[in-house]
């Protein structure tokens, strides 16, 4: 059944009239999207009468449409274009002037061509219902109706780009993608987003190996069919400030070098340095294969266990997996009847989590409480004083909220990383676990304890034990106790360099590259395949969509080649052996800790 206004994730509008069907005993066709099903109902979806009705509706839709398909970015994936092939006519009977609607300013991300709009109101319903930002609406009636932002301002939503995917015509398109390519010219690669720890499923479209756009893939358990604007538009940074060749610093100036030169210098430095004075830090965006081979390189080649995946001291008891994952699962948010947020702002830390919380509020009127006021979260919530004593009182059953948690069937507690960075985090975290266990809230079916990781690599690195269990490494780096520091995609390490020799491996000329003595150009997240573990502990594979620029290599390959230069033997013969070894390591943990690893 053809349709324009209907969408399974939005409320019923019934205003395009394209989904007309014939219902027995009804004097005229009915809109199937708005007609409730009933016993004994006889529906005919494809009769001459219905085909004529749909052709009439299509003629009305095309009457005021500019028919500018050759210059429209929606061309090739346009619902109106496709359906007009079935129900359109080759000659218009409309001889009058077509209406012209002024384009609206919706900000730097959404390009508007409102003359093409067919008033399906999908964008309006999405902004109001899913995004929770009712800044889009319709004014006027009939031919004078217009979709507008009322005050001619940017749409203030971190989900705004989804209206581009929802728009069935070319009225709303992507500004950065204007006139870049046609859909049939693009190579499409299904992969995983790394802009946060949610692990949204995405499709990366490339033209001549250049990433042109990022679109969502439907995964009801994770991101449904939405993605954040950060996910959608971060790809424009893949062309800027890229590292495309190795560099060596001479007299405070970087000079280009060959891979052989930098490998020899690194080998010489490492061989002449006590292995206890060497450490490595893994970055936030590294895939699990790259992190694992880096750990193996430090373990086996350099013989040091000075490695860490955190850039700021954060309490994490990684001995048990439930201590650092989102145990209730992302789709479990919709089942919760009470949500408590501690030290987190999900709207900006994990946009898709915030969208799920809003969905839970709309569908179940879930009560939401936050320690501290964190601003507008697109749903109403109760704000409590978030000092340490308040948290302590809640977990020791000395607060009204304690009783609400105990009385709720499925409470859900979200702990942010800012909470885990306070001095008393260990005590409060363990108090929370004891409180939940004492009141029998943790079971095999439901675990309300959820840690909201911010970065894509966090859970995977913890699964691979890339963490300093003594919790001293970050302090020792600040005290300049190491002679060689290997920054493996790590740009956020907070320390002042003195005499350390710093090796930086990464894809962009970021903060880590500025302080480095040697720069090794690596691949970005779209330029190498690898696995990522999202915040709920689900392992998913990201696939290679393009190639690294210049002489840059994939991260695992750089480490493998460096190990060969140092020991005359590679750590792994190929990527498959590396992947197999990594999963064997995880399987040993699975047997030891009885954990379940899910692989896409």
Located regions from the model:
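N-terminal export/assembly segments and adjacent metallocofactor-ligating motifs
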Residues: 1, 22-26, 33, 40-400, ...
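A basic, amphipathic helix-loop patch mediating RNA/tRNA/ribosome contacts
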Residues: 1-24
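An alpha-helix initiation/capping motif
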Residues: 10-13, 161, 288-292, 426-429, ...
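A short, compositionally biased
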Residues: 14-19, 196-200, 592
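Short, hydrophobic/aromatic-rich segments at coil-to-beta transitions
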Residues: 17, 187-191, 499
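Residues embedded in well-ordered beta-strands
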Residues: 18-20, 203, 412
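Non-catalytic alpha/beta scaffold blocks inside enzyme catalytic domains
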Residues: 307, 311-593
